[in-house]
């Protein structure tokens, strides 16, 4: 396992597909933390008004079911950033470099291997929009992501993301995911468990460690390698954590 982690870490900088090799196509049941999504027309009407945008967003989520930002492990936050949006603190609503990297990767592969969506884009999509793949829907996503970045801090956006994203196995948000997979509160997760959860949003069904333990373990190892590459953990910590994972 240690050799596998070392190989992954050394190869990350030359592998543009490492951060997303499975397209996000899963459809899940209605979330307990996100209410029924607003009509597109209603969302459009509220884009340009700061107060109305925040009102529209807050009306779509159940804040009382959120895990507060300071109760979410730093290792999970770092795992999500390393995996989903490694330049999170360096860009606004859209990561032009990330989009360019994804375009080159997908063009070379002849298929969609990597997405260029930022955490802000994923958050507004999950709260407001459908999974429809059209230019109109993408423009809506971009406009909403800009409003999100203008009106919420990076910490607030990450809190929204972690409390509304789908983690598979019927679990929306980090609170449900921690309970479903590990039978504990998020604050009690160890490094390997944080890495496992951080790898799920890319393809929740495919990487579900309960239904697909082998694929889940591979994904966890990849996330640990990404975290080591970004300097969040050491290669030794990545190798050690890759050797164990306890589900509930």
Residue positions per predicted region:
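Juxtamembrane regions of bacterial inner-membrane/periplasmic proteins
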Residues: 1-248
């Amino acid at each position: 396992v240690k050799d596998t982690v070392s190989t992954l870490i050394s190869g990350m900088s030359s592998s543009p597909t490492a951060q997303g090799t499975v397209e996000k196509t899963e459809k899940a049941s209605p979330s307990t933390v996100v209410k029924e999504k607003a009509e597109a027309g209603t969302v459009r009407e509220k884009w340009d008004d700061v107060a109305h945008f925040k009102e529209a967003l807050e009306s779509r989520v159940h804040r009382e079911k959120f895990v507060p930002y300071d109760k979410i492990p730093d290792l999970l936050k770092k795992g999500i950033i390393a995996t989903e949006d490694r330049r999170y603190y360096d860009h606004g609503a859209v990561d032009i470099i990330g989009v360019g990297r994804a375009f080159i990767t997908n063009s070379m592969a002849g298929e969609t291997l990597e997405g260029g969506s930022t955490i802000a884009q994923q958050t507004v999509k999950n709260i407001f929009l459908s999974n429809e793949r059209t230019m109109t829907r993408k423009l809506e996503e971009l406009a909403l992501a800009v409003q999100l970045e203008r009106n919420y801090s990076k910490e607030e956006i990450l809190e929204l993301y972690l409390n509304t994203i789908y983690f598979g196995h019927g679990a929306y948000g980090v609170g449900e995911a921690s309970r479903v997979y590990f039978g504990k509160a998020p604050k009690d997760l160890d490094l390997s468990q944080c890495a496992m959860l951080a790898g799920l949003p890319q393809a929740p069904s495919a990487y579900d460690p309960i239904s697909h333990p082998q694929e889940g373990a591979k994904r966890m190892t990849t996330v640990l390698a990404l975290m080591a590459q970004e300097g969040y953990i050491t290669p030794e910590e990545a190798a050690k954590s890759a050797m164990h994972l306890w589900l509930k």
